[in-house]
Amino acid sequence: MEKFIHNNILFAIIVRNDFHREGINFATDGKQSLEMAYMSHPAGHIIKPHRHVPLKRVTHNTQEVLFLKSGKLRIDIYSDDNIRIGSRELVGGDWIMLLDGGHGFEILEPSVLFEV
């Protein structure tokens, strides 16, 4: 998992399609309005019924998760004053959670995306 940090601000979290670790691996730390985790369990593993503790959360912007099902794109990440602070290429199977700042895309190959 790659955390895109600029000036001590977490802008994005990227999970690559070839990432693999056993068990539950949280990408987020509980400070974000969404929880994102990678899970890998063997057949027969049971995740017990559970509920999340109610929390009052204040959001100052829309956070989103994008899953690139297929294709290839470049995402540009921008600061709040619209200055490009970095770019990353994503390929089919990659995930990105956008937490702060702005973003734009260039589609490099025909692509299918899901946005949450």
Describe these PLM feature segments.
Residues 1-38:
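A short, N-terminal "cap"/entry segment at the start of jelly-roll beta-barrel domains
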Residues 79-100:
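Short acidic-glycine-tyrosine-enriched beta hairpin
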Residues 42-43, 61-78:
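Glycine- and acidic-residue-biased ligand/ion/polar-headgroup-sensing regions
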Residues 55-56, 81-83, 112:
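Short, surface-exposed beta-strand-loop junctions and turns on beta-sheet-rich folds
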Residues 49, 75-76, 96-98, 103-108, ...:
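Short beta-strand His + acidic residue motifs that chelate non-heme Fe in jelly-roll/DSBH
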Residues 38-60:
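Conserved short histidine dyad/triad with adjacent acidic residue
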Residues 38, 65, 110-116:
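A short hydrophobic beta-strand segment most commonly corresponding to one strand
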